[in-house]
Design a protein with these regions (language model features):
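Mobile amphipathic helical/loop "lid" adjacent to a hydrophobic cofactor/ligand pocket
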Residues: 70, 74-75, 79-198, 486, ...
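N-terminal Rossmann-like FAD-binding beta1-loop-alpha1 element of flavoenzymes
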Residues: 7-34
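Glycine-rich FAD pyrophosphate-binding loop
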Residues: 26-49
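Active-site/ligand-binding neighborhood in enzyme catalytic cores
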Residues: 136-259, 266-269
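Conserved Rossmann-like nucleotide-cofactor binding loop
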Residues: 17, 40, 289
Length: 539
């Protein structure tokens, strides 16, 4: 029941998951304190280069099935903050490998026939026979969620092993699947859980013909366009307290070990410690790196919630983000591009985006106070440990001399007039084989601690968006707040609205997928009684 004295929740981490949790709790009348190491996690102060030009830590797209983020923009009355859906191109040392069209522009057919027909002429080098070799993977996808035990069997296999057992051709693996995974899950298939790999490929590419359609922020940054309006509303209307430049250093628990009572913090600017008292619950919207650091300094909490300690031991992936301002406009056919198999990448995957094409109406904003000169390129390197060891100039030279000219030779004659290179070590979750049980659950052993993020196991609140995904992170944040409210761990003062925040499901599976799963389950459940499995699951 609503009360006159609302509960107090501390949300640690101000990514999509943290903001989702803050929204669901604030709107239920709960008092919320949101803390993050960023100087200004509200998005009100744009991230900028030393010369005052805008910068963003990674260029992230918004796919077709992002219903809850779309609903957020409508709720905030933001108008259209996105580009149209765009094409993408895939490049290797051999040149253009494939282009991804805007699938929604063509006649809509059942999946995967629609994707096959829409791209029949888009693969420039990969023979049809190699493309068809992926058929076995579609059967495995039908089997993936038959039951928990089967899912964990797939989770324990690395994706490359599964691909080979399914007899997917080497060319299909190396020229298509490997590049996709290096920029989708940020690791090569031999280092990824087969289960998460199939979830990603299904959600982003195979669920519907137009699942792969993607659009981008059409001016400024995601933080400025989406998070800043949300944070402003939560602060103005719901008294959200935001502490930027602040790290959570310790969780203190009650003497009986049943709940969190306070959160110790550390200011990055001053080094001073402080304590947030009267805490009723905590939302951990952090990754493995943050979880490990926090549990190391919270021994009582670590002892009571060993699953959080295990989560902190999971691997994480290094990312390098680069932005280049050029003295001339370089024409590139597609605004979004993937680079793979180049020796200069040293095993990483890379993307680059022509921001002057994605944001043509606001080019002056891309240049800050300087006059507009030419193209602005944003590039991200994933699985980038080796790349990160290069100097800033070495990374820029790698792009301008070895990678970008392979896409468009005019890059060779362009001059870089400004640049910014930033490294983000261990910043992205690694879904390694067998990692499912190590990933943190949404509801933990301590009832007053919940987890949120795209790496979190959502259990009975599981959502259709999968992998490294803004929509999944945001929804998991909403559900983390909902969990605290539903279980009455916290209560608010709001009486005019339902306590739990609504979550919009993604589009339903197509009939042929539902039918295929049903038939597979009927057959395989019977065969399981005799100890028979699909051949690719036999040890």
């Amino acid at each position: 029941m609503p009360s006159n004295t609302p509960s107090h929740v501390v949300v640690i981490g101000a990514g999509w998951a943290g903001w989702g949790a803050a929204k669901s709790l604030c709107e239920a009348g709960v008092r919320v304190t949101l803390i993050d190491g960023m100087n200004d996690p509200t998005g009100s102060t744009p991230l900028a280069t030393p010369s005052g030009k805008p910068f963003e830590a990674g260029t992230r797209g918004f796919w077709k099935d992002y219903p809850n983020i779309n609903a957020l923009t409508e709720e905030l009355k933001l108008g259209n903050r996105f580009t149209e859906f765009t094409t993408s191109a895939f490049w290797s040392p051999n040149g253009l490998e494939a282009t991804a069209p805007v699938f929604g522009d063509g006649p809509q057919l059942p999946s995967p026939l629609g994707q096959a027909f829409a791209t029949i002429n888009n693969f420039k080098r990969l023979p049809v026979a190699d493309r068809l070799s992926i058929a076995g993977l579609l059967v495995a996808m039908l089997d993936l969620n038959r039951n928990d035990a089967v899912y964990q069997q797939y989770d324990g296999i690395d994706a490359l092993t599964l691909f080979k057992q399914l007899r997917i051709s080497d060319r299909m693996i190396n020229e298509f699947l490997r590049p996709i995974l290096l920029v989708g899950l940020f690791k090569p298939p031999e280092e990824l859980s087969a289960a998460v790999t199939m979830e990603l490929l299904y959600y982003y590419a195979l669920a519907h013909q137009d699942s792969f359609d993607v659009r981008w922020i059409k001016s400024k940054s995601i933080a400025e366009q989406l998070l800043a309006p949300l944070s402003q509303r939560l602060r103005n209307q719901h008294h959200l307290d935001v502490l930027g430049g602040t790290l959570a250093s310790r969780l203190n628990v009650s003497p009986d070990g049943t709940s969190v009572t306070s959160v110790e913090t550390n200011s990055l600017a001053t080094g001073r410690s402080a304590v947030i008292h009267d805490v009723d619950a905590v939302v951990l919207a952090v990754g493995a790196k943050g979880m490990e650091a926090l549990m190391a300094k919270s021994p009582e909490c670590a002892a009571l919630s060993p699953e959080l300690v295990r989560a902190g031991t999971l691997g994480a992936i290094d990312v390098v983000s680069v932005r280049l301002w050029l003295d001339r406009t370089v024409p590139v056919a597609d605004p979004a591009n993937v680079l793979s198999r180049f020796q200069a990448l040293q095993g990483s995957g890379a993307t680059f985006f022509m921001l002057d094409q994605l944001q043509p109406d606001t080019q002056q904003e891309l240049w800050g106070a300087d006059p507009v000169q030419g193209s602005v390129v944003a590039s991200d390197f994933y699985n980038s440990t080796a790349i990160a060891e290069l100097s800033d100039q070495g990374i820029v030279d790698c792009l301008m001399q070895e990678l970008l000219p392979m896409v468009q030779p005019d890059f060779r004659t362009a001059q870089v007039v400004d640049q910014d290179v930033r490294r983000y070590p261990r910043s992205v979750s690694l879904f390694s084989p067998g990692s499912f049980k190590q990933r943190p659950p949404l509801e933990t052993s301590m009832s007053s601690i919940v987890c949120a993020g795209d790496w979190v196991r959502m259990e009975d609140r599981e959502f259709g968006a999968k992998g490294l995904c803004q929509e999944r992170a945001y929804v998991c944040g909403l559900e983390a707040g909902n969990s605290l409210l539903k279980r009455k761990i916290v209560s608010g003062t709001t009486q005019s609205q339902p306590l739990q925040h609504p979550v919009i499901p993604i589009r339903a599976d197509e009939p042929q997928v539902v039918f295929g799963r049903t038939i597979n389950k009927l057959v395989m459940d019977q065969l399981d009684l005799f100890g028979l499995k699909h051949p690719w699951l036999r040890s």
